[in-house]
């Protein structure tokens, strides 16, 4: 189980995850939990430096800003010491690293801001 952090100023929830490069190097990042994103992981193309395999470079998706074409990679994410190979949506317009609703199908999200509890596991 990993502990999250609530950004009160922007009303956003973040969890620290690790992105794993093909060389095994771990990069720790704060990922925004976005319940409007139905995938596993999304990130800006300038943040992609992991030598992950490309699956599709013209994948159409609807976003809050309309439809766009994105690249899809298979990336490795480490959460709470466990590694997952997941599809990663990559595009120039994605402002930060995002984890989406697919995680909530495999991980339990507990949020009680009054009690200071925010966990994913």
What residue ranges belong to the model's regions?
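Pepsin/retropepsin-fold aspartyl endopeptidases
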Residues: 1-121
């Amino acid at each position: 189980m990993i502990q999250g952090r609530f950004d009160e100023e922007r009303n956003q929830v973040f969890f620290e995850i690790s992105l794993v490069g093909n060389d095994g190097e771990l990069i720790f990042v704060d990922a925004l939990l976005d319940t409007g994103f139905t995938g596993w992981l999304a990130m800006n193309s300038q943040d992609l430096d992991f030598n992950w395999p490309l699956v599709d470079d013209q994948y159409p998706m609807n976003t809050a800003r309309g439809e766009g074409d994105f690249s899809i990679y298979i990336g490795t994410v480490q959460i709470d010491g466990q590694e997952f190979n997941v599809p990663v949506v990559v595009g120039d317009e994605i402002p930060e690293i995002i984890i989406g609703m697919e995680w909530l199908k495999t991980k339990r999200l507990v949020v009680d801001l009054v009690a200071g509890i925010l966990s994913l596991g």
